[in-house]
């Protein structure tokens, strides 16, 4: 799964859910079709990987999938049954902070109906609302 190779600090502050629009990464740049977030959420590395697998399996051997988000934020958690205190918990998972209108995945090199169907299948694996956009 996706996670940074090296970070300056092992544990980070927990960011708030930013409900504003994304000002970068909000248009299809590399492919023909894209999966655009219409809401904001934290998307975990496992969810990104599940969506990628669903998209690539639908596309078969043709075409290319571009992942436009990366999980940079480390979320920590304490084990079940441990009392409060005694420091911050260990890193549990990595998440990508996704703002509204961010392009999550792009597809190129396949037919229109296959690309839309593949992105639809991948979008169902994600915890946010989305829409399929195309370059004109």
Curated annotation (Swiss-Prot):
It comes from the Bacteria. Pfam families: Ribosomal_L16. GO terms for cellular component: cytosolic large ribosomal subunit. The keyword rRNA-binding applies. One of its GO terms (biological process) is translation. GO terms for molecular function: rRNA binding; structural constituent of ribosome; tRNA binding. Keywords: Ribonucleoprotein, Ribosomal protein, RNA-binding, rRNA-binding, tRNA-binding. Part of the 50S ribosomal subunit. PANTHER family: 50S/60S RIBOSOMAL PROTEIN L16, LARGE RIBOSOMAL SUBUNIT PROTEIN UL16M. Belongs to the universal ribosomal protein uL16 family. Binds 23S rRNA and is also seen to make contacts with the A and possibly P site tRNAs. This is Large ribosomal subunit protein uL16.
